[in-house]
């Protein structure tokens, strides 16, 4: 029996604001517990929330970038539940009138393009964080309480884990390029919940939904969905019923584990937030935000391919992160050849990042240094071999490439008036190589080049040496 999967994703993005959504407390990652809180975050009696307008600006940027319709009037609602990290016993969110609806993202999987709908996106506050100590005590950190979140809820349009992975990749890229969030999953500024059901092929009615919450990497999303597909198929084929439930992904086993069975959707008794007035969004403000939107990844890709002439694959690699793309643009602006800059960034720079498990913001190589080095390669000042030594020094120590080359005497020898006599002497001293060359043995010229390189301690420009040798040998 064949089955069809239906997948929907809920993605939370931490919006990049200086203060929280309803209080003036600062927002930063890694601060000491409960040092970025105040009476509003603690839900002290009599305090009232004060809306941070910048949250709307950032949310609207994401809405516009995903072709979503921004609602002219939105309001906040109370989602009622009790948990230690939620001191008010309710969360302020948007349930009845969200920020935006009816958007979409285009993905490409296995060579086919597909449009994935965005059901809605809404603004809400984050909860605090519980930590359970080995001493039997539990601790609550309210630093995260009230941090602004944008939740993007997809339509259930994805039909396999690869489509879900492609959707997440594209959504993350779009949000990152708007600057609304730094989308760092390892810091919790991007979190993913998945919903998956399966049904026999040809059946219209959807199967029973299984939810998986707080998946902390794209790989976990893909692997957990793949496992859950197979698990649900086995349940149905054995005559059982899939339970409406929440499960978690066990990274060690690659399996999903039951957390709780649901009897139905939770009743959070939503009602309008009485302490925050409905928020009216003027079209003129939406237009102003749209005008200020930074260049999208799709626009950059077009520029890289059409204006800079680099390959589509190279453009896609550069655009995997905004930091990488910004670094590339800065290098080209500093005078680097676009194609050479793409090659060095995608091979040498990315190789260093992967090997050392760091981001491009952590390295000491600047875009200007990369541009300077590429210019020296292109004008023949240094060889590609020497360039790798210069690159290593610059990326590890931040050394200026030009100064390093001059201080170490690495300037490539390209002066024909110096190399010409050396070539003539090497040819005179190696008559057998001349004979071999005339007999069509290509290795002969390689030997002669090697002799020149040995005499110049590797500083001779190989291209110039080859040209001079060919000319000299042809004249014999």
UniProtKB/Swiss-Prot annotation:
It catalyses: L-glutamyl-tRNA(Gln) + L-glutamine + ATP + H2O = L-glutaminyl-tRNA(Gln) + L-glutamate + ADP + phosphate + H(+); L-aspartyl-tRNA(Asn) + L-glutamine + ATP + H2O = L-asparaginyl-tRNA(Asn) + L-glutamate + ADP + phosphate + 2 H(+). This is Aspartyl/glutamyl-tRNA(Asn/Gln) amidotransferase subunit B. PANTHER family: GLUTAMYL-TRNA GLN AMIDOTRANSFERASE SUBUNIT B MITOCHONDRIAL AND PROKARYOTIC PET112-RELATED, GLUTAMYL-TRNA(GLN) AMIDOTRANSFERASE SUBUNIT B, MITOCHONDRIAL. InterPro entries: Asn/Gln-tRNA_amidoTrfase_suB/E (IPR017959), Asn/Gln-tRNA_Trfase_suB/E_cat (IPR006075), Asn/Gln_amidotransferase (IPR018027), Asn/Gln_tRNA_amidoTrase-B-like (IPR003789), GatB (IPR004413), GatB_C_1 (IPR042114), GatB_Yqey_C_2 (IPR023168), Gln-tRNA_amidoTrfase_suB_CS (IPR017958). One of its GO terms (biological process) is glutaminyl-tRNAGln biosynthesis via transamidation. Keywords: ATP-binding, Ligase, Nucleotide-binding, Protein biosynthesis. Belongs to the GatB/GatE family. GatB subfamily. Allows the formation of correctly charged Asn-tRNA(Asn) or Gln-tRNA(Gln) through the transamidation of misacylated Asp-tRNA(Asn) or Glu-tRNA(Gln) in organisms which lack either or both of asparaginyl-tRNA or glutaminyl-tRNA synthetases. The reaction takes place in the presence of glutamine and ATP through an activated phospho-Asp-tRNA(Asn) or phospho-Glu-tRNA(Gln).
């Amino acid at each position: 029996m064949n089955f069809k999967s239906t997948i929907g994703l809920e993605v939370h993005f931490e919006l990049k604001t200086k203060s929280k959504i309803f209080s003036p407390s600062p927002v930063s990652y890694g601060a000491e517990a409960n040092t970025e809180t105040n009476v509003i975050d603690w839900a002290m009696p009599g305090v009232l929330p004060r809306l941070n307008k910048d949250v709307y600006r950032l949310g609207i940027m994401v809405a516009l970038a995903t072709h979503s319709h921004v609602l002219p009037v939105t309001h906040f609602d109370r989602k009622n539940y009790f948990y230690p990290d939620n001191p008010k016993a309710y969360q302020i969110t948007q349930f009845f009138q969200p920020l935006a609806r009816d958007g979409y993202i285009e993905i490409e999987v296995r060579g086919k393009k597909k449009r994935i709908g965005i059901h809605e996106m809404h603004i809400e506050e984050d909860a605090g964080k519980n930590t359970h100590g080995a001493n039997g005590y539990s601790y609550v950190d309210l630093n995260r309480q009230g941090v602004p979140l944008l939740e993007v809820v997809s339509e259930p349009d994805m039909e396999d884990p690869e489509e879900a992975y492609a959707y997440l990749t594209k959504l993350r890229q779009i949000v990152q390029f708007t600057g609304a969030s730094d989308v760092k999953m390892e810091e919790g500024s991007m979190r993913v919940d998945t919903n998956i059901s399966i049904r026999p092929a040809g059946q219209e009615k959807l199967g029973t939904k299984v939810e998986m919450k707080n998946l902390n990497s794209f790989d976990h999303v893909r692997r957990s969905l793949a496992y859950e597909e197979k698990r649900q198929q086995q349940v149905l084929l054995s005559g059982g019923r899939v339970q409406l439930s929440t499960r978690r992904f066990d990274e060690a086993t690659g399996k999903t584990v039951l957390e709780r069975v649901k009897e139905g959707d939770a009743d959070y008794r939503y009602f309008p937030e009485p302490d925050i007035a409905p928020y009216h969004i003027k079209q003129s403000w939406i237009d102003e935000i749209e005008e200020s939107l930074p260049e999208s990844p799709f626009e950059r890709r077009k520029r890289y391919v059409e204006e800079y002439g680099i390959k589509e694959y190279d453009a896609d690699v550069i655009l995997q992160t905004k930091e990488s793309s910004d670094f590339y643009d800065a290098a080209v602006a500093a005078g680097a050849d676009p194609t050479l800059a793409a090659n060095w960034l995608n091979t040498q720079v990315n190789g260093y990042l992967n090997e050392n498990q760091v981001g491009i913001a952590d390295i000491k190589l600047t875009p200007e240094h990369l541009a300077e080095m590429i210019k020296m390669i292109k004008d023949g000042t240094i060889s590609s071999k020497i360039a790798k030594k210069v690159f290593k020094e610059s990326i590890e120590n931040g050394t200026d490439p030009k100064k390093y080359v001059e201080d170490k005497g690495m300037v490539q020898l390209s002066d024909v008036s110096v190399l010409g006599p050396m070539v003539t002497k090497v040819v005179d001293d190696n008559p057998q190589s001349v004979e071999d060359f005339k007999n069509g043995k290509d290795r002969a010229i390689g030997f002669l080049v090697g002799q020149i390189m040995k005499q110049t301690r590797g500083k001779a420009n190989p291209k110039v040496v080859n040209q001079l040798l060919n000319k000299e040998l042809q004249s014999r």
